[in-house]
From Swiss-Prot:
CDD domains on file: PPase_ThiI, THUMP_ThiI
Main location, first listed in the record: cytoplasm
Coiled coil: none
Organism lineage: Bacteria, Bacillati, Bacillota, Bacilli, Lactobacillales
Organism: Lactobacillus helveticus (strain DPC 4571)
Binding site for ATP: M183, L184, H208, F209, R265, G287, Q296
Function: Catalyzes the ATP-dependent transfer of a sulfur to tRNA to produce 4-thiouridine in position 8 of tRNAs, which functions as a near-UV photosensor. Also catalyzes the transfer of sulfur to the sulfur carrier protein ThiS, forming ThiS-thiocarboxylate. This is a step in the synthesis of thiazole, in the thiamine biosynthesis pathway. The sulfur is donated as persulfide by IscS.
Pfam family for this entry, one: THUMP
Enzyme class of the recorded protein, top EC level: transferase
Name the UniProt record assigns to this protein: Probable tRNA sulfurtransferase
Stated family: Belongs to the ThiI family.
Gene Ontology cellular-component annotations: cytosol
Keyword Transferase among record annotations: yes
Keyword annotations: ATP-binding, Cytoplasm, Nucleotide-binding, RNA-binding, Thiamine biosynthesis, Transferase, tRNA-binding
Length: 405
């Protein structure tokens, strides 16, 4: 049967009290964004759920996209029918025949907001159940843990019947927690951190440092394409490319090898903070995991964080690498993340970086440089572009150019 609409149930929104309306409106806006190329769809957000009227749009495509909208707890494709027992029985049978397999158990679950309807919930459960028993062989009822639940909702305008309860990804609607910047590399961790930030309702913009001619066009394209994968969850993400070669060259030329990485990261954080302030963000997110590499020891974090009072949030800080990889595979970023295109974090990496850098030394070495001039020139060279779901940037020409190197 062709579904006519989808009933969307909210996740944590039920705990948000007086702000509930704002959260529901944001979720509705986010759902509209991911379905905007299906113009026939109508949206009706309500206090307890959202109705999406398909108007002929394919449910399979809608289903694929709703699975990636934060703030949805569950949803069910449904069929809207007239309020007659004959229509209810006929539609219930057709839905059950599509999904029932011998040996399965079932339950009819009726809810009624129209209390003037001629049958109460128990009567309708029994009538529909008896009708299904008469028309489907080997059908068994199970009240506690059935394999199939046929849900019937009697509302003022019509009856809605569904036979599936699909799970969303939960979390909070993106945008309800405010705006922040994400320091996106081309690796495994920062895309996962981006996903987790969005899941908590944060509207993120990607900040990516690139260092031509030391980094290739393909490395930049990889970061953009990772952003395109993550844009599936929100409809669009702004990508901010920051030129970083002059800063890296200057640090390498003038500072001791052991502190190259520490001072480089201090510059990155200062630039991210400038961009955050300029674009109205409230926090900085990154993909650091405690102790994973030299720059991510607690001592390194102290020496690097010193340059800002802005909250620096690390969603994967306490996760094992295997946990991060599993989540990267689940969200679809892993295969691209492991492509071997060197980014600016790897090309200037010293062979023996300090794992326990001293804050006073980091400040002393950084003070030898024209910090403000270097930062301002990098800020003058930033480029901002919107990236949409699944946009491709690693094209054949880039691959050919890479082969010639």
């Amino acid at each position: 049967m062709e579904y006519t609409e989808v009933m969307v149930r909210y996740g944590e929104l039920s705990t948000k009290g007086k702000n509930r309306k704002d959260f529901i409106n944001r979720l509705a806006s986010n759902v509209e964004k991911v379905l905007k190329d299906l113009p026939q769809i109508d949206f009706h957000p309500r206090h307890d759920r959202m109705h999406i009227v398909l108007n002929g749009a394919p449910f399979a495509e809608v289903d694929k996209r709703l699975k990636k909208v934060f703030g949805i707890q569950t949803y069910s494709p449904a069929i809207k029918i007239p309020k007659t027992l004959e229509d209810i029985e006929k539609t219930s049978l057709e839905l059950m025949q599509e999904t029932f397999k011998p040996g399965m158990t079932f339950k009819v679950n009726t809810k009624r907001s129209d209390h003037k309807f001629e049958y109460d919930t128990n009567q309708l459960n029994n009538l529909v159940g008896d009708y299904l028993f008469d028309h489907i062989d080997h059908l068994k009822a199970e009240m506690k843990h059935p394999d199939l639940v046929l849900r019937i909702e009697v509302r003022q305008d019509a009856v809605y019947i569904s036979n599936q309860l699909l799970h969303g990804i939960g979390g909070m609607p993106v945008g309800t927690a405010g705006k922040a910047v994400m320091m996106l590399s081309g690796g495994i961790d920062s895309p996962v951190a981006s996903y987790l930030a969005m899941k908590r309702g944060v509207d993120i913009e990607m900040v990516h440092f690139f260092s031509p001619p030391y980094t290739t066009e393909k490395a930049l394209a990889k970061a953009k394409e990772l952003t395109g994968i993550l844009a599936n969850y929100v409809g669009k993400i702004n990508f901010i490319a920051v030129p970083f070669a002059e800063i890296q060259e200057t640090i390498k030329e003038k500072l001791p090898e052991g502190y190259l990485m520490t001072v480089q990261r201090r510059f990155m954080l200062q630039l991210a903070d400038r961009i955050r302030a300029k674009r109205g963000g409230l926090a900085i997110f990154n993909g650091e995991s405690v102790g994973q590499v030299a720059s991510q020891t607690l001592q390194s974090m102290v020496a690097i964080n010193d340059v800002t009072t802005t909250p620096v949030i690390r969603p994967v800080a306490t996760m094992d690498k295997t946990e991060i990889i599993k989540l990267a595979e689940d969200i679809g970023t892993f295969d691209l993340s492991i492509q071997p295109f060197e980014d600016c974090c790897t090309i200037f990496a010293p062979p023996r970086p300090k794992t326990k850098p001293k804050l006073d030394k980091a400040r002393e070495y950084e003070a030898r440089l024209d910090v403000e001039g270097l930062i301002q020139r990098a800020m003058d060279g930033i480029e901002v572009m919107p990236i949409y779901p699944n946009e491709k940037f690693i094209n054949d020409k880039i691959e050919e150019d890479q082969d010639l190197l």
